[in-house]
Amino acid sequence: MSGASDFLSKGIDLVQKAIDADTATRYEEAYKLYYNGLDYLMLAIKYEKNPKSKELVKSKFTEYLTRAEQLKDHLEKQAQNKSTAESSVNGSTKAKKSNGDGNGSGDDNDDADTKKLRGALAGAILSEKPNVKWSDIAGLDAAKEALKEAVILPVKFPQLFVGNRKPTSGILLYGPPGTGKSYLAKAVATEANSTFFSVSSSDLVSKWMGESERLVKQLFTMARENKPSIIFIDEVDALCGPRGEGESEASRRIKTELLVQMNGVGNDSQGVLVLGATNIPWQLDAAVRRRFERRIYIALPDVEARTRMFEINIGDVPCECTPHDYRTLAEMTDGYSGHDVAVVVRDALMQPIRKIQQATHFKPVIDETDGKEKLTPCSPGDEGAREMNWMDLATDELKEPPLTIKDFIKAIKNNRPTVNEADIAQHVKFTEDFGQEGN
């Protein structure tokens, strides 16, 4: 609730500034403030739990959106008039010549608009691969196999997918926060020999509200031009929530365009995969849900996956934990998401640093890596203990204490799981009704 109220207060503050600028005829400033405020109001609507409050915010959202679109039209006409005036001063015959008989200005405007839309989407194309391999993801075997079937196989063996046998065109990954949905998408981007478009609702909504549906259309056009391609939409629920009376016209248009493009009406969409991710799949519009042919539940990791997660996250940091210790830690973290385990490991990795900071005594030990004598934190009663602190040590004198299972147990006590039973129950119910297991 505090999140919704924070978004609401920020949105109201920005909208009030927009109204002040609007009244003072500073229309360009007002336009930007309106849309910044609308972004926050949209987030407030998403997280508001009280139905009456939600309806009130929605009605205000629609009112301010209408005014913002009016200002946008006014500013565009103003810019067009200015451009026309400048061209007439600089020689209108030159402009006519470039347009042939002078009737081609509409096409030029269309080209300019298309360039603008493509420019807005340019950042969505991943030119560098994220370097996340399938082996970096613990568990989720069913989800990985489904993604390989939809993404890797059709590119590597196109002869397998002919006639009525076609690869999946829409996959929805859903589950509690921190279970690895976006991480799976990164693995797809790394492993697939395809153009990867990564967008969120803000890329398609908050740039230009009035042109959002054209932005969606251009996204799919670019994907078809560069196929095989993958469109990854994170937090797809923010873009495709259920229909209702309080839904804004802009939101409705975006959703309609997305449905049309995902359906491939009038276009050849073979070779384009839409990959969606959401934490709240039950908030998806039913028609959008149907467009995602496969809906895969990314559940909390089991004990085997958590064991592997501890090993992966520790990496090459010096550690005295045995395979049995990793298993013990995995059993202690039942109910933890992949992100929760990563947080525990990050906390544990800092424990040796904290020992160094808090130590009052250090003793000499031989560093096995270079055979030199160095100093490491110890108890005052240890043999050879010297009273000193870390500030007294030279940079190359310090030998960091190794990680032990005690460091991890302490970190587990400090970091509790972030997913509750009620959230899991909703995902299980959705899976029983519409989805499939991804573990």
From Swiss-Prot:
- Specify the inducers: Expression is regulated by GCN2 and GCN4.
Q: Give membrane topology per the record.
A: Peripheral membrane protein
Got a GO cellular component term for this one? ESCRT IV complex
Q: Which domain of life is it from?
A: Eukaryota
Record's subcellular location: Endosome membrane
Kindly list the positions annotated as binding ATP.
G175, P176, P177, G178, T179, G180, K181, S182
Task: Report the InterPro entries cross-referenced here.
Answer: AAA+_ATPase (IPR003593), AAA_lid_3 (IPR041569), ATPase_AAA_core (IPR003959), ATPase_AAA_CS (IPR003960), MIT_dom (IPR007330), MIT_dom_sf (IPR036181), MT-severing_AAA_ATPase (IPR050304), P-loop_NTPase (IPR027417)
Q: For this UniProt record, give its keywords in alphabetical order, as a comma-separated list.
A: ATP-binding, Endosome, Membrane, Nucleotide-binding, Virulence
> Region Disordered: start and end of each range?
76-113
Describe the disruption phenotype: Leads to defects in endocytosis. Displays a characteristic class E vacuolar morphology and multilamellar structures consistent with an aberrant prevacuolar compartment. Missorts several vacuolar proteins to the extracellular space, including carboxypeptidase (CPY), vacuolar protease A (PrA), and vacuolar protease B (PrB). In addition, certain soluble secretory proteins, such as invertase and acid phosphatase, are missorted from the pre-vacuolar compartment (PVC) to the general secretory pathway prior to exocytosis. Also results in a decrease of canonically secreted proteins.
Q: Where is the composition biased (Polar residues)?
A: 80-93
Residue span(s) of domain MIT: 8-75
A GO BP term here is: filamentous growth
Identify the CDD domains for this entry.
MIT_VPS4, RecA-like_VPS4
Give the recorded effect for A4V. In allele: CaO19.11814
One Pfam family name is MIT
Q: Which GO terms describe its molecular function?
A: ATP binding; ATP hydrolysis activity; protein homodimerization activity
Please describe what this protein does.
Pre-vacuolar protein sorting protein involved in the transport of biosynthetic membrane proteins from the prevacuolar/endosomal compartment to the vacuole. Required for multivesicular body (MVB) protein sorting. Catalyzes the ATP-dependent dissociation of class E VPS proteins from endosomal membranes, such as the disassembly of the ESCRT-III complex. Required for extracellular secretion of the secreted aspartyl proteases SAP2, SAP4, SAP5, and SAP6. Its regulation of the pre-vacuolar secretory pathway is critical for virulence.
Q: Which family does it belong to?
A: Belongs to the AAA ATPase family.
Quaternary state and partners of this protein?
Monomer or homodimer (in nucleotide-free form). Decamer, dodecamer or tetradecamer of two stacked respective homooligomeric rings (when bound to ATP); the dodecameric form seems to be predominant.
What is the name attached to this protein's record? Vacuolar protein sorting-associated protein 4
The source organism is Candida albicans (strain SC5314 / ATCC MYA-2876) (Yeast)
Gene label:
VPS4
